[in-house]
Amino acid sequence: MIVFLGVLGLLVWLEEKYSMDHVLDGLDFATALDKTVVEPGEDFSWTMTINNRKRLMVPYLQMREQIPAGLVFSENGENVAAKSSGDHLSVLYLKGCQKTELERRVLLKKRGRYFFRGVSAEAGDFLGLQTALETYPELKEIVVKPAPSGWEELPRLLGGYAGEYVVKRSLFEDPVLIRGFREYTGREPLRSISWVQSARQSRFLVKEQENMTDLSCTILLDVECRDEEREAELLEQCFSMVRSICEELEKQRIAYDFQTNGVIAGAMGNWNRIGEGLGPGHLETVLEGLGRMTYDCRMGSGEFLSGIRKGLRSGKSLI
């Protein structure tokens, strides 16, 4: 009997040691978002996939998902993050070779860039006496656009300025002058590609056209702010106003380009200008850039406007 108990104890100890040494082996964690750019308050799917690739079960698995501040559940509006840690806590049991997906519908209310930064996993051993901790870093980004400003006077202001032009354009066909060619960036419509020039140069080139009677507009966003206490509030209002102006220009079919002395961070690059264009793709590019903008300033207002004035094409003026 003593020998039997000794052998049983040895087997339990070996199983305990093996499970402790390998409890986190073969575990994979992956975060997935069904959208990369959203409106303020627009819900999106946030899915965590846990895959146990080994045959050994995981009797206790606690996950701490590192999530962005301000994330709330779509159904009830409750904060996703725990008050104590700021992370989202989940506890699971995994069978051997089991794959589990946790899908949540969530939303973010404020403009900006947000990051899901992976998981800290804590797993228990065979007897539940010890735990092992491992971090699985990850970086998933989502961008929230600025909200429209609700500027009620904007349609009237732009309508009065552009109304005469719209009437003339409906009566006469615009003469078009091709000024040259430039490299295709992916934002231009396919009809603007010059297939002859592209074949000659072995790369996509688009025509730079000048509509001789066409009205176009340059939107300038100056982010230099001297009121440090209200900087965030005032700049957020500016981002929303730029969005409303772009959307109104889209409604009136007026081509526009966008320039700023602000910093637009992230995957789009640190660009400061979007060329002249029109259409949903052009608008979405501007809105994503506004969502990515920080409160930093690349140059002062004087230097920014001076550079704009020097680069004006003939027929354009700075008001």
Regions found by a protein language model. Name each.
Residues 303-319:
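Exposed acidic/Ser/Thr-rich ligand/metal-binding surfaces
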Residues 209-211, 248-250, 277-280, 308-312:
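Short, conserved, surface-exposed binding loops centered on an aromatic residue
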Residues 267-306:
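Short, charged loop segments at secondary-structure junctions
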Residues 189, 254-257, 295-302, 317:
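Residue-level signal for secondary-structure boundary elements
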Residues 1-8:
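Membrane-targeting alpha-helical segments
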Residues 68, 146-147, 174, 279, ...:
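Alpha-helix initiation/capping motif
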Residues 11-268:
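An amphipathic, basic-hydrophobic helix/alpha-beta surface used to engage anionic
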Residues 172, 186, 291-295, 310-313:
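Generic surface-pattern signal
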